[in-house]
Amino acid sequence: PNTVGGSVVNRFCGSSMDAVHQISSRIETGDIEMGIAVGIEDMFSVPMGGFNPDFHPELAEQEYYIGMGETAEILAREGSISRDEQEEFAIKSHEKALDAWENGRFDDEVIPTDIYGEYIIDKDEGPRVPDIEKIKSLSPAFMENGTITAATSSPVSIGASAILITSRTYAEKNSIQIKATIKGRSIVGVDWRRMGMGPLPACLLYTSDAADE
C-alpha cells in the first residue's frame, strides 16, 4: 500500500547489504516486523570513463584516483595470486554456474521479466562455456604487466535482487519458510587501495575461520 515507507541506501558495492543491516536492526528494536531489501545494479547507465568527478590535485598525489581493477591488481600482487590461479578460478566459477542453471538450482529464485512483450529474460547472461585458448590470449586489462584480464573480471551487468526479512515470530505466525538467520552485522573500513578486502576484517569479528574460507 501507499502507506509503506521506503528509503535509498548508498554504500556503493555494499548498498543492498547495508539495506539488510538497516532492516534487521529495526526489526531487533521492534520498530518493524518485516521489510524488503532490494539491490539494483545498472552498469549500463554509467558512461564510459565514469561520471567525471571534479579533479583534485592533492587527492591525485595520494593515488586516490585509481580504478577497482587496479585495487584488485594490488591484492593479487600482495597475495601472490598468479594469473594462472585467477583463470583457473574463473573457469571453475563459470562451469559451476552453468551446471547450476542446467540443473534448475536457480529456478525458484529467478523472476522471469517480460521485455515489452517481445522476449522474456529468465536466465543470467553472464556464465558461458570457457574458451581456454581465448582466455590465455587476453592482455591485462588494468596494468601493463598485470595479471587480471577481461576473463577474470566482473562483466558489465544489469540486474536486481530482493530479500524478505522478518522477525522469527512474524515468520512463524504467517507460515513463512525461514531459509536463513542473521547472526550479526558489522561495517569496517580499509585502505582504499585494498577495498576488495573490506568484508574480511568484519567477518573475523564473528568467526576465526573466515580467513581460511
Question: What label would you give each PLM region?
Answer:
Residues 1, 52-74, 119-136, 195:
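Active-site-proximal gating segment of KS-fold condensing enzymes and close homologs
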Residues 1-32, 63-70, 132-155:
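Conserved catalytic cysteine-centered active-site region
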Residues 5-10, 35-41, 85-92, 110-115, ...:
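Beta-strand segments within the central parallel beta-sheet cores of soluble alpha/beta enzyme folds
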Residues 11-40, 76-106, 162-169:
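Active-site-proximal alpha-helical scaffold in enzymes
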Residues 28-79:
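Flexible glycine-/small-residue-enriched beta->alpha junction loops
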Residues 85-173, 178:
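N-terminal extracellular/periplasmic Venus flytrap/periplasmic-binding protein-like
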Residues 172-205:
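Glycine- and Gly-Pro-enriched alpha-helical subdomains that act as flexible
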Residues 206-213:
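Conserved small/polar residues in nucleotide/adenosyl-binding loops
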